[in-house]
Amino acid sequence: MNFQKMTYSNLKHNRYRPELGKTSGQISKMNTHLIDEQNLAGSKNWVDRSLAAVWHPCTQMKHHESLPLIAITRGEGAWLYDDQGNAFLDCISSWWTNLFGHANSRINQAITKQLEKIEHVMLAGFTHAPVVELSEKLSALTQGNLGHVFYASDGASAVEIALKMSHHYWQLQDKPEKKKFVCLENSYHGETLGALAVTDVALFREAYGPLLQSVFIAPSPDSRKVKEGKSAEGLVSECAEALETIFAKEHQNIAAFIIEPLVQCAGQMAMHSPEYLRRVRALCDQYEIHLIADEIAVGCGRTGKFFACEHAEIWPDFLTLSKGISGGYLPLSLSMTTEAIYRAFYRDQTSQGFLHSHSYTGNPLACAAALAALTIFESDQVLEKNIERAHELAHAFRWAKEDSRLEHWRQQGMILAFDVKSSVLKNPSSFAREMFSASLLEGILIRPISNTIYVMPPYILTASQTQNMAEAVQRALTQVLK
């Protein structure tokens, strides 16, 4: 099949259904969904209206002339359903956000209960129970090391807050020259101008280069860079030494170093050792530079611990969270910081406070969802059970280790990725779109990054669901590469 010409109606052959554990043939006999002309017309109507009125994110809209746009009407557990009844397993947690399944009854109830009290109130001059309780619980999760929480609505905004706080802190310390930032090569921290400045993915930043502050870019300790005969430890040392070279020369001008701990997610799931984080923490202390841990994607248990930094037994000066913190329900982000940094802004002069704000800062509904998510973590022993889920994930994708067309199989907790060798790609620039389309025909949602295929599923899959997911990825890949 020419996946570039795939249309919405092709999905009527969707054979990957929620009745997992059965073969696709058994499923077809049980419950094959047929699209009638009236329903198909309705579906096209929603799609056409969306294409006419909605500018979709991270998308070249012209690609939708051939790439399917799916009208989702509901979700249940790990499944998304379109308006034709086709089911898609959400293998990437709806852009890494959904932790405990769609329409989770406990999170639904928490939001509904809060909705009956207060839906929103400005956080300047006011406070409310959900934001207080959430802040206290998050602080406790850091053993009090990061005891102050500033809220926003999306990941990039949380990064902006950390960058601005760091910059402003050094001004208050009479070191205004410390205003530069350091990031890793191939890093991604968001799309707003400050966050984009510390992003090193050309696809996202090239068009806006003239608007962005210049930054220092340090080599990434990406484990895929380990050469034959070399060790991962050696790569960590090389990258740490290169970072120290930057610090030694420019520390008087540097405010902070920002990093996604353990996994550079949008950077093709590049993974590195916790030892690198330990080296970075020591260097930041030595050269009086703030450490910003961007845990927007890797936080909330995704790497195996609640905070990725815990693997290295270090705490940053700033830590950002978003995506999974509300269980994937509502826009919520935050930047946590230390008592020392908070106290630097605690002054008589208004101008020396941190005057950043957003209209929906600390929204009660979003905070209620986050509190429900934290309760699920505790009551369901999610982190402990994710150890077994991670083993099941590795076992299900063992075929990818043995496939000669693939390389760089890697895993960190509930993130698993591998790369398709460039030598087997017929059209490298369109591979991700072709794989996305092929996966829909198998009833799964994946969204490759260039030649990197990855899964980041919700924390609710059974072993059989995980196995079926892996088999569906394998079938889709076979179709694209044949």
Where are these regions (language model features)?
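Short hydrophobic targeting helices and cationic amphipathic motifs
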Residues: F3-Q4, L11
